[in-house]
Swiss-Prot record:
Native species: Bordetella pertussis (strain Tohama I / ATCC BAA-589 / NCTC 13251)
Consequence when changing H33 to S/D: Abolished protein-lysine palmitoyltransferase activity and ability to activate CyaA
Known role: Protein-lysine palmitoyltransferase that catalyzes palmitoylation of the protoxin (CyaA) at two internal lysine residues, thereby converting it to the active toxin. Has strong preference for palmitoyl-CoA (hexadecanoyl-CoA) substrate, compared to other acyl-CoA substrates such as myristoyl-CoA (tetradecanoyl-CoA).
Entry protein name: Protein-lysine palmitoyltransferase CyaC
Short name of one Pfam family: HlyC
Effect of mutating A140G: Reduced ability to activate CyaA; impaired ability to palmitoylate CyaA at two sites
Keyword flag Cytoplasm: yes
Length: 185
């Protein structure tokens, strides 16, 4: 129990600890996450829990799916893409560029679809991106998403602008970076 002399917090420790436990349980059931070190669990979950930047879905009081996101500025986005482990502290909420950091739905495609719907409802007017790494792989690719209320053409224009800025930043910081897939910016 916390001492009564401690200043009150806007966070509810009981709810935060419960969320962390539910998320840890999902990590243990995820083929991709289960062998990751505990420090990655802390690094990737504590900030979004404290900031409320996550969705946790439950079915019959059992956690079935989880995602978290960061809202980055262009510089933080560049650092994150170059070194995903660089995400820390204020980087989780320093801009308006939505990046999905974790996506765990280990039990069914229905849970995955429900999580996608919940995220689209939570961010109806946003485009988002994520770094997607296949299990056992070491190369990430950028996946793109758009909210339900966002016009497809407006979303494409915004994503193309973000993509061009990211490619320019990567080239400037990494010399001969050459993107694969979508061509050059």
């Amino acid at each position: 129990m916390l001492p009564s002399a401690q200043a009150p917090s806007l966070l509810n420790p009981t709810d935060d600890f419960a969320a962390l436990g539910n998320i840890a349980w999902l990590w243990m059931n995820s083929p991709m996450h289960r062998d990751w070190p505990v420090h990655l669990l802390a690094r990737n979950t504590l900030a979004p829990i404290q900031l409320g930047q996550y969705i946790l879905l439950r079915c019959n009081d059992v956690p079935v799916a989880y995602c978290s996101w960061a809202l980055m500025d262009a510089d933080t986005e560049l650092s994150y893409v170059m070194a995903p482990s660089s995400l820390g502290g204020n980087a989780w909420n320093c801009g308006d560029r939505l990046w999905i950091i974790d996506w765990i739905a280990p039990f069914s495609r229905d849970d995955n679809r429900a999580l996608r719907r919940a995220l689209a409802e939570r961010h109806p007017d946003s485009v988002g991106r994520s770094l997607r790494v296949r299990r056992g792989g070491d190369t990430a690719r950028v996946k793109e998403y758009r909210g339900r209320a966002l016009d497809a053409a407006a979303a494409r224009a915004q994503l193309d602008r973000y993509h061009a800025e990211l490619i320019a930043g990567l080239r400037a910081s990494n010399g001969g970076y050459a993107p694969r897939g979508r061509g050059t910016a």
